A protein has these predicted regions:
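Alpha-helical adaptor scaffolds
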Residues: 92, 99-148
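N-terminal segments that cap or nucleate solenoid repeat domains
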Residues: 51-62, 69
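Short glycine/proline- and aromatic-enriched beta-strand/turn motifs that initiate or cap beta-hairpins
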Residues: 21-48, 56
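Amphipathic alpha-helical repeat scaffolds of TPR domains
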Residues: 27-40, 62-84, 109-130, 156-171, ...
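TPR/TPR-like (Sel1-like) alpha-helical repeat modules
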Residues: 137-150, 157, 168, 173-195
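Structural marker of alpha-solenoid helical repeat scaffolds
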Residues: 62, 107-108, 152, 189-192
Length: 200
C-alpha cells in the first residue's frame, strides 16, 4: 500500500467514523426532543396534545428523514381526534394524518406494523365521529389493520391496546363481544415479515 493510498484509506475511515458519530448525535438529540415533548403529556389535555403535535412537526422539520417524529405527529393527532371527534381542528388533523401515513409508507425503514396500527386507529376515529354512518364502512378495515399489525409484530403494545379498546367499544354498541371466530372470518392479506427494526 503506497503512502497516498494509505492516507486516502485513513481519511475515508475517519470520514465514516465522523459521519457515524454525527448520525448518532443527531439521533440522540432527536430522541431527547421527542422525550421532552411527550413528557408534557403525563396528564393530557386537548391543548397539551395540540402543543405536542406542533412540537413534533418542528422536530420533523429538523430530522426530515426520520420516522419517529412522523409517527408521533400521526399518533397524537389521532389521540386528539378521538378525544374531540367534532372539534374544528379534527378534520384537518385527520387529513394530515392520512398524508403522514402515506409518507411513512414510502420510507424504506418504516415499520409496517406501526403503519397498520395508525391506519386502524384512523378508521376507528372515523367510526367514533359517526358510528351510524361509518361503523359498517370502516369496521372491517379496523379489524384487519390491527390483526395485520399484530401478525407483523406480536409485541406491538399500541396495536394490542387499541384493538382491545375497539372490541370493548363494539361490545358496548352491540351488547355482544367480538369473538375469535368472527375475527378470523374476515379475509386479510398479510405482508411478509419485516426485517428487524432499525432505530431512526
Amino acid at each position: 500500500m503506497t503512502f497516498q493510498t494509505f492516507k486516502r484509506f485513513v481519511l475515508m475511515s475517519v470520514f465514516f467514523m465522523t459521519t457515524s458519530v454525527v448520525i448518532y448525535a443527531q439521533q440522540s438529540t432527536m430522541q431527547g426532543l421527542i422525550g421532552q415533548s411527550l413528557a408534557k403529556l403525563q396528564q393530557p389535555t386537548s391543548e397539551s396534545i395540540l402543543n405536542c403535535i406542533a412540537e413534533m412537526k418542528r422536530i420533523d422539520d429538523m430530522f426530515p428523514d426520520s420516522i419517529q417524529p412522523k409517527f408521533q405527529i400521526a399518533l397524537q393527532s389521532l389521540n386528539y381526534s378521538v378525544m374531540n371527534p367534532h372539534a374544528p381542528q379534527t378534520e384537518n388533523l385527520l387529513k394530515e394524518t392520512e398524508e403522514t401515513i402515506a409518507k411513512m409508507e414510502n420510507i424504506k425503514h418504516a415499520d409496517p406494523s406501526d403503519i397498520c396500527t395508525l391506519r386502524g386507529f384512523l378508521y376507528m376515529v372515523r367510526i367514533v365521529q359517526n358510528p351510524g354512518q361509518n361503523g359498517q364502512r370502516y369496521y372491517l378495515e379496523v379489524m384487519q389493520d390491527y390483526e395485520k399489525a399484530l401478525k407483523l409484530n406480536p409485541d406491538n403494545q399500541l396495536a394490542k391496546q387499541l384493538q382491545q379498546k375497539f372490541f370493548e367499544g363494539m361490545k358496548q354498541q352491540t351488547g355482544k363481544p367480538v369473538n375469535k371466530k368472527q375475527r378470523l372470518f374476515y379475509p386479510r392479506t398479510i405482508s411478509p415479515e419485516p426485517k428487524k427494526r432499525v432505530a431512526t
